[in-house]
Amino acid sequence: MTTFYTVVNWLVILGYWLLIAGVTLRILMKRRAVPSAMAWLLIIYILPLVGIIAYLSFGELHLGKRRAERARAMWPSTAKWLNDLKACKHIFAEDNSPVAESLFKLCERRQGIGGVKGNQLQLLTESDDVMQALIRDIQLARHNIEMVFYIWQPGGMADSVAESLMAAARRGVHCRLMLDSAGSVAFFRSPWAAMMRNAGIEVVEALKVNLMRVFLRRMDLRQHRKMVMIDNYIAYTGSMNMVDPRYFKQDSGVGQWIDLMARMEGPVATSMGIVYSCDWEIETGKRILPPPPDVNIMPFEEASGHTIHTIASGPGFPEDLIHQALLTAAYAAKEHLIMTTPYFVPSDDLLHAICTAAQRGVDVSIILPRKNDSLLVGWASRAFFTELLAAGVKIYQFEGGLLHTKSVLVDGELSLVGTVNLDMRSLWLNFEITLVIDDAGFGSDLAAVQDDYISRSRLLDARLWLKRPLWQRIAERLFYFFSPLL
C-alpha cells in the first residue's frame, strides 16, 4: 500500500511539473510581447495552479471553434463585396492631407478598401442630445436599423430609445440588435429583451458567457463596439453605451460618465455596415451583407463632405491594425498631439511614440479621468506618468466625472474617434471600431471639445508628482508589472 501511494505521489508530482513545463513552453512559443510573457510566467511560478488556470482561460485569443469557422467562411464573400464596392469610385477619396496620407494608405492596404468622402459629421457631447437625435432618426427609418453596444442599461432615456426601436419594428422596419453578454447582463435579465423580440426585433446576445466553455473560448474577449446604422446612410459611433448617465453606476464614486458620439450621413454608413455584417455572421451564422451606396437615395456632398476611414479590430479582422494606426498617427504629428482616454495602459511601442513626439518638439497632451472605475487600471496608468512627464508630455486629470471619450487629434486635422481605449484589451483583444477623419473643420470641432475637457481638468505638476509617497510608487510598479495582462 505504501508503494502504491508513493507511486501515485510521484505521478502527481511529475504531472504537476509536466503541466508547468508544458504551459511555459506554450508561452515561450507564442509570438507575444516580452513583458506579457514575463508577467504570465511570474504568475505561473508564484501561484502555479491559479496561474495555469488563468492562462488557459485568458492568456490566449480563443474566439471559439464555431465562431472561428464562421469568421473564415465569411471572408470570400466579404472580399468579393469589397471588390464590387470599388466600382463605386465616386465615394472614394483620392487625396489626403500630408498629416493623414500615411495612415490612410496603411488602412487601405491592410483592409482592402480606401477612405470614403462626402460624409456629413456632427459631434454630440451630451447624452440627451445623442439619444434625442437617435430617436428622431429611428422614427424616420424606412428600411433597416442595425445596432451593436457593449452595454445597454435599462432606465431613463435608454428606455425611450427602446420604445422607439420597437415602434419601428412594428411598422415594418427590419431591426437588429447585438449586445455583449457580459456588458449588457442587466438588459438580458430585464423584461426588455423579451419585449423587443415580441415586437419583431432580432436580439442577439454576443459572446455569451458560459462557464462550462471557459477553456474553449476566452471569456474576457468582448464585443466592445458601439454602432448604429439606419437605412444604410445614417450612422453613429463613439464611446457612449446605450445608458442614461443619470441611472448608470451611480454608486461607483466617479461621477457621471462623459462621452462623445459622432452622427454621420454618407458612404461611411456602408463601411460600418460591412463591419456589422461580419460581426452578425460570426455570432449567428447568417449573412447580411449591406447594399452598396445608392447615389439615388443618398445625398452625396463631395465638395463639402468629410473623408473617413473605418478601422475595425478584433478576431477575424486585420491583426494589430489599430495599434499600427495609433503609432502612425503619433509619428505623423508635427505640432500638436492630444489624446483622450479613460484607461491608459499603453504598449511599450506606443509609449515610446508618444514620448518621442514630445521630445522632438510636438505639444503632446493626454487627458485622463482623475477618478477611475477600475482600481487596477488606475494604478497601472500612474506607472507611466514619470516617463511621460520627463519627456515633456502634459497630463491633464479630468475632474468633471469619468471621462469616457476615446479620441486622438493630430495637428488639428487628423482625428481618431471611436471605442478604442489606450490599453492592452482594446489594442489587442476586443471587437472595436475607430473612425479616422481627415478634415480640418472636424478637427477644429474636436479640438473645442478637448479644450472643454482641459478646462475642467487639473494639470499634473511634475515636481509634486516626484514627491508622492513611497507606498504609491511601490503600488504603481507592482501594477505596472502586470499591465500587459490588464
From Swiss-Prot:
Enzyme superclass (EC): transferase
Domain PLD phosphodiesterase: 219-246, 399-426
GO-annotated biological processes: cardiolipin biosynthetic process
Membrane-spanning segments: 3-23, 38-58
Origin: domain of life: Bacteria
Enzyme Commission identifier(s): 2.7.8.-
Membrane topology: Multi-pass membrane protein
GO molecular-function term, one example from the UniProt record: cardiolipin synthase activity
Cross-referenced InterPro entries: Cardiolipin_synthase, CL_synthase_A, CLS_N, PLD-like_dom, PLipase_D/transphosphatidylase
Reaction catalysis annotation: 2 a 1,2-diacyl-sn-glycero-3-phospho-(1'-sn-glycerol) = a cardiolipin + glycerol
Active site per UniProt: 224, 226, 231, 404, 406, 411
Assigned GO CC terms: plasma membrane
Subcellular location(s) per record: Cell inner membrane
Pfam families, per database record: PLDc_2 (PF13091), PLDc_N (PF13396)
Keyword vocabulary terms for this entry: Cell inner membrane, Cell membrane, Lipid biosynthesis, Lipid metabolism, Membrane, Phospholipid biosynthesis, Phospholipid metabolism, Repeat, Transferase, Transmembrane, Transmembrane helix
PROSITE patterns: PLD
Disulfide bonds: none
Membership in a protein family: Belongs to the phospholipase D family. Cardiolipin synthase subfamily. ClsA sub-subfamily.
Functional description taken from the UniProt entry: Catalyzes the reversible phosphatidyl group transfer from one phosphatidylglycerol molecule to another to form cardiolipin (CL) (diphosphatidylglycerol) and glycerol.
Protein name per its UniProtKB record: Cardiolipin synthase A
Organism: Klebsiella pneumoniae subsp. pneumoniae (strain ATCC 700721 / MGH 78578)
